[in-house]
């Protein structure tokens, strides 16, 4: 994300970015606090989104596929057309969806992914990837901007380790897709569950699935009984707890 924002900042240094859909907090806070600000809209209707884009006139649009933690997926195909019409780059974070499950680069100008999570499966290495769409109208400007940026690099040891732990990523993603979907089905029949949030329920996510794609390793749910009951449930849950996802443990 940081490198994506550096590219955009070089092209449009005086404009804020626009986050479409409520995101993981750091995805919003990084452009808001370090670069030239960020705006957030949570509208899902594409006509309303287009009106907001015209009003704000951002440097770039940023979308999570799907959003974390609500697992919503906006209509990126329509938003991509709007972005092209208005000459605004579209940036996608596919960390939760995974490019093994969904095809987002076809509709985005830049796709970034956290390699710390699903790709590594170990949660003990900090790394990320960035893909530029070669068909983007901005491709030459993106490349020129990248050449001017002092890109952070992994150490040799971290690179070797990341390659090693990622060798089974295809199999892990398949297993995580399956396990998460099974958990969703079990929770759907539980009397204490009020709402479940999962990409399977989103037509926009389904429209992006690859031939072997699934719905990823993340779901969220809301309990009956309110906040106090949710706290008691969380504190009693005997699983590893942390701010990451996609690990083998």
Predicted segment positions?
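Conserved C-terminal alpha-helix-loop-beta "cap" of PLP-dependent enzymes
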Residues: 195-249
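Conserved PLP-enzyme active-site core in the AAT-like
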Residues: 2-192, 197
